[in-house]
């Protein structure tokens, strides 16, 4: 347990574990935050310098710096010029007040039944928290804390006007979206907004399969029947859509999830024509998933931009990929013809995103920080994609594996030739400490077989240094899965 001369007696009650699936900087952040909440690290305590703490803990300076920046962004620490980081005053617990009791120990699990620790996180929802702009975000929030006390009062349920204006301008420039700020609604997550939208929809909804299971669940939970329609090389099948009774179509045209297909301009025009044949009785929900991360080609304009502000398209997007899932800010552009119904149903609702977070994002966008941040992310993620692709092509022979979905988003598909059963691949992934999904996991009908043996590999949270080892581990688990299935 490290202790530092010249500072308050400080120690970590939880040792850092390099073998854990939780990154070291997050382990350090959690441990220090717990000490501050408990009052062990008292208000006004000056934290050790980054190099000194890094040496004490045998970790990199970047690990300590990231943990400190996370603590500062969340208000645990304050940074003073030439004085380093200090524990915030208001964190001290009143005398006599005890911190919350630690949760009871979990029920013991027999070692033979315990899942091996995850060593390679290739899940599709991961992002790299090390790319989060901690310094800029913390500075903008600090400025707001001192200059905008009105943010403590209730705001517009649709979202703060400044953020809706900033989003309207950003979307017009970078996604071709045509809307007024009045058409924008801000909420705590895409699923939340979709749930509010569902009661306004005119009938059954077509959803893609393979596709996003949460979208189907949210729609059905809110009384909208879903029709699961197939995806081909150009996206949702228009033949299947035209033959269905769907009045709504939920699509991910910029980066179909999970296949990675981009819907071409011709298919987009056909989809808009499908909706235009029944004005006011058909709508398209455009989930602009991963449109920010297009590495090798220019993005097509949004469907909403093609249809216009008066068109039948509801545009959905979120900051969970471009910033972080914990930011919990998503937004929706409503067609003008739905504004009246929205206001009538939700005018007494309260907003679900804090005003400080909204104003911070507004300033982050209008100050030009967001576009620079995205450029930095694209560079980092493209390099990581290239490293993972190179690792896969080194570990697998060309006749063993086909890669797809490489040009957009933060995941790719790896289709095995003559694959073992998906159940064997799942078991082997668990055994070898790999967190990933299979394309069949996103089959919403439960009947498709063409997706068998296709791994869906996310690289958003995969450290650059682990790409080569990840390729080798994937080769081992595929070999083990094949051997296990051959013995059955």
Question: What are the residue ranges of the model-derived segments?
Answer:
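N-terminal basic, amphipathic alpha-helical segments
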Residues: 1-142, 149-152, 337-338, 343, ...
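Short glycine-rich anion-binding loops that position phosphate/pyrophosphate groups of nucleotides
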Residues: 127, 254-256, 321
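Residue-level detector of anion-binding/catalytic polar loops
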Residues: 225, 283, 434-435
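Conserved core of the PLP fold type I
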Residues: 141, 148-280, 292, 296-310, ...
């Amino acid at each position: 347990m490290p202790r530092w001369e010249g500072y308050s007696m400080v120690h970590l009650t939880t040792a850092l574990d390099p073998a854990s699936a939780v990154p070291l900087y997050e382990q350090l952040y959690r441990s220090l935050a717990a000490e501050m909440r408990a009052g062990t690290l008292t208000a006004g305590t000056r934290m050790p310098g980054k190099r000194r703490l890094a040496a004490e803990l045998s970790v990199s300076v970047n690990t300590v710096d990231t943990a400190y920046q996370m603590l500062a962004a969340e208000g645990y620490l304050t940074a003073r010029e030439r004085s380093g980081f200090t524990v915030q005053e208001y964190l001290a617990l009143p005398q006599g007040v005890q911190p919350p009791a630690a949760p009871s120990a979990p029920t013991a699990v027999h070692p033979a039944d315990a899942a091996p620790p995850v060593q390679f996180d290739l899940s599709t929802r991961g992002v790299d928290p090390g790319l989060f702009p901690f310094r800029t975000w913390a500075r903008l929030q600090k400025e707001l804390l001192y200059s905008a006390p009105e943010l403590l009062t209730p705001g517009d349920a649709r979202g703060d006007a400044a953020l809706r204006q900033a989003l309207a301008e950003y979307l017009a420039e970078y996604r071709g979206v045509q809307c007024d700020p009045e058409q924008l609604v801000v909420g705590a997550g895409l699923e939340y907004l979709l749930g509010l939208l569902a009661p306004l929809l005119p009938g059954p909804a077509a959803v893609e399969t393979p596709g996003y299971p949460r979208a189907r669940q949210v729609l059905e939970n809110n009384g909208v029947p879903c029709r699961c329609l197939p995806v081909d090389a150009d996206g949702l099948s228009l033949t299947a859509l035209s033959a269905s009774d769907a009045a709504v179509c939920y699509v991910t045209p910029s980066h179909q999830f999970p296949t990675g297909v981009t819907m071409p301009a011709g298919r987009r025009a056909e989809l808009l024509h499908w909706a235009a044949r029944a004005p006011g009785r058909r709508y398209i929900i455009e989930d602009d998933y991963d449109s920010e991360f297009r590495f090798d080609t220019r993005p097509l304009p949004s469907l909403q931009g093609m249809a216009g502000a008066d068109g039948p398209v509801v545009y959905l997007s979120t900051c969970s990929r471009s910033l972080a899932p914990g930011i919990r800010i998503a937004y929706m552009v409503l067609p003008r013809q739905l504004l009246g119904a929205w206001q009538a149903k939700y005018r007494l609702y309260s907003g679900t995103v804090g005003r400080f977070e909204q104003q911070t994002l507004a300033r982050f966008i209008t100050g030009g920080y967001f576009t620079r941040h995205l450029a930095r992310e694209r560079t980092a993620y493209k390099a990581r994609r290239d490293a993972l692709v190179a690792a896969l092509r080194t570990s697998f022979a060309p006749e063993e594996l086909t890669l797809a979905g490489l040009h957009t988003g933060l995941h790719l598909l790896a289709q095995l030739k003559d694959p073992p059963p998906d159940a064997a691949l799942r078991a082997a992934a668990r055994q070898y400490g790999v967190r990933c999904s299979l394309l069949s996991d996103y089959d919403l009908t439960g009947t498709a077989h063409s997706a068998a043996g296709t791994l869906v590999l996310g690289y958003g949270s995969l450290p650059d240094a682990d790409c080569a080892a990840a390729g080798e581990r994937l080769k081992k688990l595929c070999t083990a899965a094949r051997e296990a299935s051959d013995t059955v």
